[in-house]
Amino acid sequence: ELTFAGVLGGKKFQYTYEDGFCISLDADFVITGEVTPGANKPEGPFGDHLGYYSLAHDFPVMHVHKVYAKKNNAIWPFTVVGRPPQEDTQFGALIHELTGTALKHEIPGLKEINAVDAAGVHPLLLAIGSERYTPYLKEKRPSELLTISNRILGTGQLSLAKFLFITADDSSANEKLSVNDIPGFLRYCLERIDLTRDLHFQTQTSIDTLDYSGSGLNSGSKVVLAAYGEPLRKLCTSVPVSCPGARLVLPGVLAMQMDKFSSYEKAKKEFEALNEKLKNENLSEVALLIACDDAAFVAETASSIRCCFSF
């Protein structure tokens, strides 16, 4: 926070001490207090930046000592949280602007990264890196990209990502890759990903506190989708006849209409039935199936697919 304050203000962080507390000289308001280890109280439920309500959990309590404010024209900042685009949209854009070039130096081999706003910023990362480990081999496969991926998922707020798509810009490719061209970036990755090799799961790891898709509070899984090399498939541009009721979201990406979630037991049976139905079908041009309860919405706009990567 101190580093960010300095970058944001364009000068070193100015402070003083009073009553044993560090006081910012640039802040409009400062609240000082003490936290007693183990003295927790329930917090929540409250609305979060993904548009849902959190559950109640015990968190540390601060006993306020004093509240300081500037004498004149003090501004009390506040924000509104909810489904994107709201709070994280502005914060995300600002952080991208401030840290975009710095991350390339912080993470060796990283060229571009985009924390996608429509997914809630944290859950979905798109990245372009270098692939220099084995230039003497004919086979092109993710290698250095995996090293970069681990560094990304071990760096600050980037560690909150649930899905990380990463590839390398191949100089032989006719198109210029950009993480900001999300449909083009996903198409490039999905044409090249080897689904028997390029899905790298991290299980029983730390995740966002607000993510309830895990096995417990702050505990769950995430996945790296690393794609590099020559195209392995041509992506479909229409819904295959074997997938009636599905909607085409992007080339090679289908939204499959399912019932609204009611229980894990029912969902398990639905997916078993879907697997049985599709296992003998020719889906070679389909790289990604999205199971959802509103396929029409997911296919409606390019940003809708990004929402599917929230949790």
Feature names for model-found ranges:
Residues E1-F311:
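Charged, compositionally biased interaction regions
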